[in-house]
UniProtKB/Swiss-Prot annotation:
Compartment annotation: Cytoplasm
Gene3D superfamilies (alphabetical): Hexapeptide repeat proteins (2.160.10.10), Spore Coat Polysaccharide Biosynthesis Protein SpsA, Chain A (3.90.550.10)
Uppermost EC category: transferase
Note accompanying the cofactor annotation: Binds 1 Mg(2+) ion per subunit.
Family indicated by similarity: In the N-terminal section; belongs to the N-acetylglucosamine-1-phosphate uridyltransferase family.
Name of this protein: Bifunctional protein GlmU
A Pfam family hit: Hexapep
InterPro entries in UniProt: Bifunctional_GlmU, GlmU-like, GlmU_C_LbH, Hexapep, MobA-like_NTP_Trfase, Nucleotide-diphossugar_trans, Trimer_LpxA-like_sf
Complex formation: Homotrimer.
Pathway where this protein functions: Nucleotide-sugar biosynthesis; UDP-N-acetyl-alpha-D-glucosamine biosynthesis; N-acetyl-alpha-D-glucosamine 1-phosphate from alpha-D-glucosamine 6-phosphate (route II): step 2/2; Nucleotide-sugar biosynthesis; UDP-N-acetyl-alpha-D-glucosamine biosynthesis; UDP-N-acetyl-alpha-D-glucosamine from N-acetyl-alpha-D-glucosamine 1-phosphate: step 1/1; Bacterial outer membrane biogenesis; LPS lipid A biosynthesis
Binding positions for Mg(2+) per the UniProt entry: D102, N224
Length: 453
């Protein structure tokens, strides 16, 4: 179904109390307006006309990778005026869908229903019935069909009793919408050009107006303050959690789970409370994610356990691994099958080989570590000389004792042993033992100082 979209995103968002344009505030880790853009792209919109005003530079910087037609609304003179700024780009025979950058949860199904419902040469309008319609434009019907929309400030007392309200979302043909927009005036209580007045214009021409309801009213709730944004955040997260539960993922507490990207899960995955998923995350079968962990743009293979409060970003974790608690895997970290990293271990751009372990208080950066290696507590790969990064290479079956500093570039051969407390600056051959310690001294007759009375 061919259509183009106008997204209204020019509002300042005064009640957000922020210097950032309202539509750039995030929901599930993504700007609200980006949710709307993604929905349109998923449905195959031919053109997306983004009407902006306040914070234009911020908007264009935040959405630099989006394929949209930027339309400036220099003065905010109402929704009708905003859509009219984009009207020179409308093709006469295409459907024009009007959406809002601060209404991020509208679904693809609802939009498809609206597009399909548009009468020939008429308008399809998205409406919703609210128990408390205060503040919304009322849908005025005459013996069934919609004949007009009356804004709250312009409504009579009788009209204020109407509970069916306008969401602002509509579809019309480009040719008709351009004509109706050109005929708008601002003779109303707010002195603005209302988009809603095109409904009356269509009715006056004898055009049909078809009302469609969303699957759930939360889809058409807008955001004007942080309270409303928080409400939509929880609604969105609840919806995502429900889908995961239906797919067989065990969320220990769905209300304490945040998905801020995409998650692909195998079978029998268990996710404990307060876990945050960001970016694109893939989890295999029989994986356990401990409480308070953060996973971003990473892959975790089958039968792996991520213990509580681990942070994994841009990393790959193999099968049968154990990570954490309190582990940080940074971009480029890779754990091969059966590897273990424990509490307060940090890895970046480093590979830990099959069956290797670094269980305590360790930094592994720019390192290649082979199979069956034991990395003791307090080991540091000294990879940075103040100007450049250097690599540490450790072969298979190496034992690195506690509190060692491996000053890169350095290579340790297979089966070597590095004694505790060693500062290593030279390569080590296969099977060698290397120890660099200060001589141990025993001071005869020494006594502790006595405390002053």
């Amino acid at each position: 179904m061919k259509f183009s979209t106008v997204i209204l995103a020019a509002g300042k968002g005064t009640r957000m109390h922020s210097n950032m344009p309202k539509v750039l505030h995030t929901l599930a880790g993504k700007p609200m307006v980006k949710h709307v853009i993604d929905t349109c792209n998923n449905l195959g919109a031919q053109n997306i006309h983004l009407v902006y005003g306040h914070g234009g530079d911020q908007m264009q910087q935040a959405l630099v990778n989006e394929s949209v037609n930027w339309v400036l609304q220099a003065q905010q003179l109402g929704t009708g005026h905003a859509v009219d700024q984009a009207s020179p780009h409308f093709q006469d025979d295409e459907k024009i869908l009007v959406l809002y950058g601060d209404v991020p949860l509208i679904s693809e199904d609802t939009i498809e229903s609206l597009l399909e419902a548009q009468p020939t040469d008429g308008i399809a309008l998205l409406t919703v019935v609210l128990e408390d319609p205060t503040g919304y434009g009322r849908i005025v019907r005459k013996r069934g069909p919609v004949v007009a929309i009356v804004e709250q400030k312009d409504a009579s007392e009788e009209q204020k009793l109407i509970k069916e309200v306008n969401t602002g979302v509509l579809v019309a043909t480009g040719r008709d919408l351009k004509r109706w927009l050109a005929g708008l005036n601002n003779n109303n209580a707010q002195g603005e050009y209302y988009l809603t007045d095109v409904i009356a214009a269509a009715h006056d021409e004898g055009r049909a107006v078809e009302a469609v309801h969303p699957s759930h009213s939360i889809e058409v709730e807008g955001v004007n303050d942080r309270i409303q944004l928080a409400r939509l955040e929880r609604a969105f997260q609840a919806r995502q959690a429900k889908k995961l539960l239906e797919q067989g993922v065990m969320l220990r507490d769905p209300a304490r789970f945040d998905l801020r990207g995409t998650l692909q899960c195998g079978s029998d995955v268990e996710i404990d409370v307060n876990v945050i998923i960001e970016g694109n995350v893939s989890i295999g079968n029989n994986v356990v994610i401990g409480a308070g962990s953060i996973l971003k743009d990473c892959e975790i293979d089958d039968n792996t356990v991520i213990r509580p409060y681990s942070v994994i970003e841009g990393a790959t974790v193999g099968e049968n691994c154990t990570v954490g608690p309190f582990t940080r895997l940074r971009p480029g970290a890779e754990l091969r099958d059966d590897a273990h990293v424990g509490n307060f271990v940090e890895m970046k751009n480093a590979r830990l080989g099959e069956g290797s372990k670094a269980n305590h208080l360790t930094y592994l950066g720019d390192a290649e570590i082979g199979k069956g290696v034991n990395v003791g507590a307090g080991v540091i790969t000294c990879n940075y000389d103040g100007a450049n990064k250097h690599k540490t290479v450790i072969g298979d079956d190496v034992f690195v004792g506690s509190d060692c500093q491996l000053v890169a570039p350095v290579t340790i051969g297979n089966g070597a042993t590095i004694g505790a407390g060693t500062t290593l600056t030279k390569n080590v051959a296969e099977g060698e033992l290397v120890i660099t310690r200060a001589p141990e001294r025993k001071i005869a007759g020494w006594q502790r100082p006595a405390k002053k009375k």
